[in-house]
Curated annotation (Swiss-Prot):
Top-level taxonomic group: Bacteria
Alphabetically ordered keywords of this record: Amino-acid biosynthesis, Aromatic amino acid biosynthesis, Lyase, Tryptophan biosynthesis
Protein name in the entry: Tryptophan synthase alpha chain
Metabolic or biological pathway, per its Swiss-Prot or TrEMBL entry: Amino-acid biosynthesis; L-tryptophan biosynthesis; L-tryptophan from chorismate: step 5/5
PROSITE patterns assigned to the protein according to its UniProt record, in alphabetical order: TRP_SYNTHASE_ALPHA
CDD domains, alphabetized: Tryptophan_synthase_alpha
Catalytic activity: (1S,2R)-1-C-(indol-3-yl)glycerol 3-phosphate + L-serine = D-glyceraldehyde 3-phosphate + L-tryptophan + H2O
The gene coding this protein: trpA
Catalytic-site annotation from UniProt: E50 (proton acceptor), D61 (proton acceptor)
Assembly description: Tetramer of two alpha and two beta chains.
NCBIfam families, per database record: trpA
EC number: 4.2.1.20
Function recorded in the entry: The alpha subunit is responsible for the aldol cleavage of indoleglycerol phosphate to indole and glyceraldehyde 3-phosphate.
């Protein structure tokens, strides 16, 4: 783990509460608005920020995040300018961990070594690359770990006991449990099923297990936070951004406040989750 990631999860354990991990697409709908959103997230209650890397063929993403990526690409967002977002954010916040999430193709084109150098310089703490399985660890995972950048793996309901050790072998930072099969933005599954899955993963690792896909409301966050080390929210935030834009996809004065309001509510739910579990 990086020092920031280590410290954040240690602090959360001391507070006996799960992390709120918030995803948004870098550059959606434009660089400056995206930076405004990113800067507002920690004060609204985000503990870890997932920064989406826009890509033209996002196979694991639902319609909301696909459209966010299209808006970002249309506005000229690139992998370099996504790193620039993190670099600008670090000028005011050196405590909140940043995890870049996306696909391998843009990183490969950018150049793995150059990307890792620039990621470190920009204050990136971890990577989630959804289309790189453990069998391809030499491509990016091993070089990233050697540089001190966390490589966070996804586990799913179909990741069985045979596959799980391979998934977890080089995982660091936290484990991201995708609480259903399918694309992002789907419905929330039964929390009791999630509890069992989290326990199954924890039998194989001491890393925090964070749960995402389908979390949309404070009540969802409260329910998942009661059984997981972190709650990941993505599509709900992306939808909040989309709903604040003009018909032609431009930011309005409501865009950043709309996201802030949503995240504050989610944070309230997460902070109430352990109290609910203890009742």
């Amino acid at each position: 783990m990086t020092v920031r990631m280590d410290k954040r999860f240690a602090d959360l354990r001391a507070e006996n509460r799960p992390a709120l991990i918030t995803y948004f697409m870098g550059g959606d709908p434009d660089f400056q608005t995206s930076l405004g959103i990113m800067k507002a997230l920690p004060e609204a209650g985000a503990d870890v920020i997932e920064l989406g890397m826009p890509f033209s063929d996002p196979m694991a993403d639902g319609p909301a995040i696909q459209l966010a990526g299209q808006r970002a690409l249309k506005g000229g967002q690139t992998l370099k300018t996504t790193l620039d977002l993190a670099r600008e954010f670090r000028k005011q916040d050196n405590a909140t961990p940043i995890v870049m999430m996306g696909y391998y193709n843009p990183i490969y084109i950018y150049g793995v070594e150059k990307f890792l150098d620039d990621a470190i310089a920009s204050g990136i703490d971890g990577l989630i690359v959804v289309d790189l399985p453990p069998e391809m660890d030499d491509e990016l995972c091993i070089p990233a770990l050697a540089r001190g950048i966390n490589f966070i793996r996804l586990a799913t309901p179909t990741t069985d006991g045979k596959r799980l050790p391979a998934v977890l072998k080089n995982t660091s930072g936290f484990v991201y449990y995708v609480s259903m099969n399918g694309i992002t933005g789907s419905a929330l599954p039964d929390p009791s099923l999630i509890s069992g899955a989290v326990g199954r993963i924890k039998a194989h690792t001491e890393l925090p297990v964070c749960v995402g896909f389908g979390v949309k409301t404070a009540d969802h966050a409260k329910a998942i936070g009661a059984v997981a080390d972190g709650v990941v929210v993505g599509s709900a935030i992306v939808n909040q951004i989309a709903g604040s834009l003009t018909k032609d996809g431009q930011a309005t004065a409501d865009t950043v406040p709309a996201v802030t309001t949503l995240v504050k509510g989610l944070s309230t739910g997460v902070r109430a989750s352990r109290l609910a579990a203890a009742e």
